[in-house]
Each structure stands twice: as C-alpha cells, then as structure tokens.
C-alpha cells in the first residue's frame, strides 16, 4: 500500500535510497516484489500519459504527488508504479561486458524482465531501475527495466525509490 499526497524524492542514488529505507526500518523491494506490486497498473500505452499515469513529459511538469492520478494504482493499492519516477530496487545484475538484446516475459528469480535500453555501465555489476518516469512516455510500462547495469551512484531528476517491509 502507498501513502497518498507524498512528493517523491528525486536525484537519489541507489545507496541513498537503501539508507533512507533502512532509516525508516524498511528496505528497497526486490525486483520480484516490485513486479508483484505493479500488477494491475494501467499500461502507459492506454492513454497519452495525461490521465492514467504520469508518463508524458510536458514543459514545466514535475513528478506528481503520489496518488494524484486516481487511476494509476496497482491491484495491490500501490500508487504510481508506472510513470512518475523510475524506482531503484534492491537487486543488482551481475557483471556484463555488453548490453544488447531484448528480454520479455521471461520468468527468472528476479521477476519478469524487459530490457528497453537506458544508461549503462560496461563490465561492472549494476543496479536496476523499474517502472519508468514522467520523462519516458510509453517506455514507462509495468515490465520496463529502464536502466540495465546502471551504476548505483547514478542520479537523475526522474530517479527515485519506494520502500518495502
């Protein structure tokens, strides 16, 4: 369940997100937990990003307070799992010397994965960003991994996190 009317934090590294969750006696969700929590959230392809979920960048637009898009809620009651901000999850992917290809609907220990591109490091383990942001439009889908092998010290206006118990 998410809290409504919270302004999400941005420009957060994976390490800062992990520390913030720990300070709240919580933790970052695993990729599999995130995948279960997103079920039932509208796909950004269902509208132009202005009514369902905050997925369409418009000049002057920022991430919206949680729950401000009434229809952007998952079956589990989590707000804004698609759009608003990309979210760090606990899982890292192993070292990779190249990033290429597409994964879709593949069952793995870390959940169903779909690679859509994103900033990547080469040759180092990387953290995962899930869900897309208001900056990504239709790429902000429920199965999107918008960063594969992203350095965990990366920050961005469209990067945030959520905590789990």
Question: Positions of the model-derived regions?
Answer:
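Short aromatic-cysteine micro-motif
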Residues: 1-79
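Surface-exposed recognition segments
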Residues: 85-165
